[in-house]
């Protein structure tokens, strides 16, 4: 199970600022934090993802005015993974952003196993 709970050495404000920095680097837009949404995603009765998705408004982005972001631990505790997903249909909610991220991670794992 992936745990997408908030964490940062400097607390919640640093965590939000760190996500804003990643969003600016990846998407070239200033992001304003709007809210935190808890998400639990299950498959066949098992929880496969549980955490909090941060919702940001984007300014001057060519495709959307919203982005979802979170960080989760990896096999290497010193190297957490930051995920950002643009609010572009069919991604229209924090939950759908998590679902898209899970599908993408599954595809990447399959490709790595084949290659």
Show the residue positions of the predicted features.
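Mixed-charge, Lys/Arg-enriched low-complexity segments
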Residues: 7, 78-115
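Extended hydrophobic/Leu-rich segments
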Residues: 19-26, 39, 67-70, 98, ...
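Acidic, low-complexity, intrinsically disordered interaction modules
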Residues: 35-92
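Negatively charged, low-complexity tracts enriched in Asp/Glu with abundant Ser/Thr
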Residues: 7-49
């Amino acid at each position: 199970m992936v745990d997408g709970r908030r964490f940062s050495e400097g607390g919640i404000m640093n965590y939000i600022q760190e996500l804003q920095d990643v969003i600016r680097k990846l998407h070239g837009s200033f992001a304003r934090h709007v809210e935190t949404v808890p998400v639990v995603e299950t498959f066949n009765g098992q929880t496969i993802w549980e955490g909090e998705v941060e919702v940001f408004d984007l300014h001057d982005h060519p495709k959307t005015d919203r982005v979802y972001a979170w960080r989760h631990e990896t096999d290497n505790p010193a190297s957490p993974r930051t995920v950002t997903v643009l609010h572009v249909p069919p991604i229209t909610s924090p939950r759908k952003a998590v679902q898209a991220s899970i599908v993408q991670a599954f595809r990447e794992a399959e490709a790595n196993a084949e290659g």
